[in-house]
Regions:
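Short, hydrophobic secondary-structure boundary micro-motifs
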Residues: 37-38, 65, 80-83, 90-94, ...
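Short alpha-helical functional segments enriched in proximate histidine and acidic residues
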Residues: 12, 74, 112, 116, ...
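Hydrophobic alpha-helical transmembrane segments of membrane transport/permease proteins
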Residues: 16-72, 169, 173-213
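Generic alpha-helical structural context detector
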Residues: 27-28, 69-73, 147, 166, ...
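Alpha-helical transmembrane segments of integral membrane proteins
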Residues: 2-3, 109-114, 118-142, 158, ...
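An internal, D/E-rich "acidic patch" concept
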Residues: 59-128
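N-terminal signal-anchor/first transmembrane alpha helix
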Residues: 1-62, 102, 106, 124, ...
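Hydrophobic aliphatic residues
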Residues: 26, 30, 39, 74-75, ...
Length: 354
């Protein structure tokens, strides 16, 4: 297992480089003048003409040279200093928010992670529990009802369901506002006496014993959590039900019942563990998707996460920000897939990772 994990970690940089090279190559399909127009807002006014911009940033260099400069930095012709470079911790300047990309992501990633964590609790819990319940009561009333709910949830587009709950619970009832915090809670969070531990407001509020801020942050999370949890819960329920039905037909469960084991023991100790492989696969991919930022959901609810940042960056042609998000997303995806593969070995000893 240790050798397998080490080997996968060694592959991680190769995958990240491959993803960023692909995006960089797509960006390089634009002419130097077109690319200069994308970055012109990053350049001080004294730079002048487009030719000066192209010369300063080497936009007419070969693609591999430009990629190398993006990774390790580029020496400034005037000062001789090396500027930029992903390996030096500099992802460039974001014109979308007017600040360094790394600084923006340091605020956006915790926000997206907080949303993903809270959405994963009902999604995974209800998805697996109700999926097992549906399979155990196959073709009975409860199975039919759960199947209808799962089909409805899986078929409704995210933006439609999000707008529906937003109109009902915010526009009409005024219960759960969009955004991340109320104005009064933001003032408390930004005060000198408030200590920031994780940049996740719900967890930081608990650590600061600010329970009113915790409730306010949680209230702002209700609608995006509901949207993400229901839509993904529906798919996870269907996968769990299908996997459990396959396992429940196996003869070893008949043998377990013949030995006098309670049905609950048969289901939880013998059936469910053997049905977890596809559940872990789907659940892991869904969770990785949530951590990468859910663009539509964050945009609908005005939630300042990585997904909404990516949407705004794409709309404003902020290529540097898009590259930064792609770099982080590829890291999350590779590490998430590694975690899923490792969980296979713990759940099912028959799987040997060699």
């Amino acid at each position: 297992m240790t050798t397998y994990i080490a080997r996968r970690l060694l592959i991680l940089p190769i995958i990240v480089v491959g993803v960023t090279m692909l995006i960089f190559a797509l960006l390089s399909m634009l002419t130097p003048y077109e690319r200069a127009s994308l970055y012109v807002s990053d350049v001080p006014k004294r730079q002048g003409s487009m030719e000066a911009i192209i010369e300063k940033y080497g936009l007419d260099d070969p693609v591999y040279v430009q990629y190398w400069h993006w990774m390790v930095g580029r020496r400034d012709a005037d000062t001789g200093e090396i500027r930029g470079g992903v390996l030096r911790g500099e992802l460039g300047f974001s014109t979308t928010v007017g600040g360094p990309v790394l600084e923006v992501l340091s605020r956006r990633i915790p926000a997206t992670a907080e949303l993903a964590i809270w959405a994963a609790v009902p999604m995974i819990g209800l998805g697996i529990l109700l999926g097992v319940l549906s399979a155990v009561h196959h073709n009975r009333l409860i199975d039919q009802v759960l199947r209808v709910f799962s089909i409805v949830g899986w078929s409704i587009p995210t933006f439609v369901f999000g707008l529906i709950v937003l109109m009902i619970f915010y526009a009409r009832l005024g219960w759960f506002p969009p955004g991340r915090l109320s104005d009064w809670a933001s003032q408390i969070v930004q005060s000198d006496t408030y200590r920031v531990y994780t940049r996740m407001h719900t967890f930081d509020a608990l650590l600061n014993m600010q329970f009113d801020v915790f409730l306010d942050a949680l209230k702002h999370l209700v609608l995006p959590i509901t949207t993400l949890a229901y839509l993904n819960w529906a798919y996870l329920l269907r996968v769990t039900r299908s996997s459990m039905l396959d396992v429940l037909r196996q003869e070893y469960l008949t043998t377990a019942r013949a030995k006098g084991l309670f049905e609950r023991v048969v289901i939880m100790r013998h059936a469910l563990p053997n049905a977890l492989i596809p559940i872990i696969t789907v659940g892991g991919l869904i969770l990785v998707g949530l951590l990468n930022g859910v663009v539509i959901t964050e945009t609908i609810f005005n939630y300042p996460g990585m997904g909404s940042f990516l949407a705004h960056a794409a709309l404003t042609l902020d290529a540097i920000s898009v590259l930064g998000v792609a770099l982080v997303s590829s890291l999350i995806l590779v590490v998430g897939n590694l975690a899923v593969d490792v969980m296979y070995g713990f759940v099912d000893p028959r799987i040997r990772l060699q």
